[in-house]
Amino acid sequence: MLLAIKDFFNSLLLKELFKGMALTGRYLFARKVTVQFPEEKTPISPRFRGLHALRRYPNGEERCIACKLCEAVCPALAITIESDVRADGTRRTTRYDIDLTKCIFCGFCEEACPVDAVVETPILEYHGEKRGDLYFTKDMLLAVGDRYEPQIAAAKAADAKYR
């Protein structure tokens, strides 16, 4: 009976409402933690896994040796590779496609590559208006690699002691 009377006065005096308003008031004037993304950017981790790229050797030859380990290890089956044998007996890719609509950005392809040919860059801002815009071919991946090679090489060098 005493508990029922206590509950009645608490509800009559709107105690819970004032407790909630006090909590709201406490955070109303606190420092804001929201980042307004397009204008403000947060620091990106050096190991961030973003857009894929294919790298070249300093002499301009592409690194990929068509071992197809990245295709085999990809859990999302997002990588498609076709290869051909050259006159000197080495294999090179004729087709290297990554479907970013399937990719889960796990980084297994980068870890499996024995020659560091496929890497994930720190690029996080890319979009497509059509589904096909997120289907990257070998030439597109090589262009991304050529454009961001200094950043990729610096990130690989900084991370080398942990690999």
Swiss-Prot record:
<keyword id="KW-1278">Translocase</keyword>
<feature type="domain" description="4Fe-4S ferredoxin-type 1">
    <location>
        <begin position="54"/>
        <end position="84"/>
    </location>
</feature>
<comment type="similarity">
    <text>Belongs to the complex I 23 kDa subunit family.</text>
</comment>
<keyword id="KW-1003">Cell membrane</keyword>
<keyword id="KW-0874">Quinone</keyword>
<feature type="binding site">
    <location>
        <position position="67"/>
    </location>
    <ligand>
        <name>[4Fe-4S] cluster 1</name>
    </ligand>
</feature>
<feature type="binding site">
    <location>
        <position position="103"/>
    </location>
    <ligand>
        <name>[4Fe-4S] cluster 2</name>
    </ligand>
</feature>
<dbReference type="Pfam" id="PF12838">
    <property type="entry name" value="Fer4_7"/>
</dbReference>
<feature type="binding site">
    <location>
        <position position="109"/>
    </location>
    <ligand>
        <name>[4Fe-4S] cluster 2</name>
    </ligand>
</feature>
<feature type="binding site">
    <location>
        <position position="106"/>
    </location>
    <ligand>
        <name>[4Fe-4S] cluster 2</name>
    </ligand>
</feature>
<keyword id="KW-0411">Iron-sulfur</keyword>
<dbReference type="GO" id="GO:0050136">
    <property type="term" value="F:NADH:ubiquinone reductase (non-electrogenic) activity"/>
</dbReference>
<keyword id="KW-0830">Ubiquinone</keyword>
<dbReference type="GO" id="GO:0048038">
    <property type="term" value="F:quinone binding"/>
</dbReference>
<feature type="binding site">
    <location>
        <position position="113"/>
    </location>
    <ligand>
        <name>[4Fe-4S] cluster 1</name>
    </ligand>
</feature>
<keyword id="KW-0004">4Fe-4S</keyword>
<feature type="domain" description="4Fe-4S ferredoxin-type 2">
    <location>
        <begin position="94"/>
        <end position="123"/>
    </location>
</feature>
<feature type="binding site">
    <location>
        <position position="64"/>
    </location>
    <ligand>
        <name>[4Fe-4S] cluster 1</name>
    </ligand>
</feature>
<protein>
    <recommendedName>
        <fullName>NADH-quinone oxidoreductase subunit I</fullName>
        <ecNumber>7.1.1.-</ecNumber>
    </recommendedName>
</protein>
<dbReference type="InterPro" id="IPR017896">
    <property type="entry name" value="4Fe4S_Fe-S-bd"/>
</dbReference>
<feature type="binding site">
    <location>
        <position position="70"/>
    </location>
    <ligand>
        <name>[4Fe-4S] cluster 1</name>
    </ligand>
</feature>
<keyword id="KW-0479">Metal-binding</keyword>
<keyword id="KW-0408">Iron</keyword>
<dbReference type="GO" id="GO:0005506">
    <property type="term" value="F:iron ion binding"/>
</dbReference>
<comment type="subunit">
    <text>NDH-1 is composed of 14 different subunits. Subunits NuoA, H, J, K, L, M, N constitute the membrane sector of the complex.</text>
</comment>
<keyword id="KW-0677">Repeat</keyword>
<comment type="function">
    <text>NDH-1 shuttles electrons from NADH, via FMN and iron-sulfur (Fe-S) centers, to quinones in the respiratory chain. The immediate electron acceptor for the enzyme in this species is believed to be ubiquinone. Couples the redox reaction to proton translocation (for every two electrons transferred, four hydrogen ions are translocated across the cytoplasmic membrane), and thus conserves the redox energy in a proton gradient.</text>
</comment>
<dbReference type="GO" id="GO:0009060">
    <property type="term" value="P:aerobic respiration"/>
</dbReference>
<dbReference type="InterPro" id="IPR017900">
    <property type="entry name" value="4Fe4S_Fe_S_CS"/>
</dbReference>
<keyword id="KW-0520">NAD</keyword>
<keyword id="KW-0472">Membrane</keyword>
<dbReference type="InterPro" id="IPR010226">
    <property type="entry name" value="NADH_quinone_OxRdtase_chainI"/>
</dbReference>
<dbReference type="GO" id="GO:0051539">
    <property type="term" value="F:4 iron, 4 sulfur cluster binding"/>
</dbReference>
<feature type="binding site">
    <location>
        <position position="74"/>
    </location>
    <ligand>
        <name>[4Fe-4S] cluster 2</name>
    </ligand>
</feature>
<dbReference type="GO" id="GO:0005886">
    <property type="term" value="C:plasma membrane"/>
</dbReference>
<keyword id="KW-0997">Cell inner membrane</keyword>
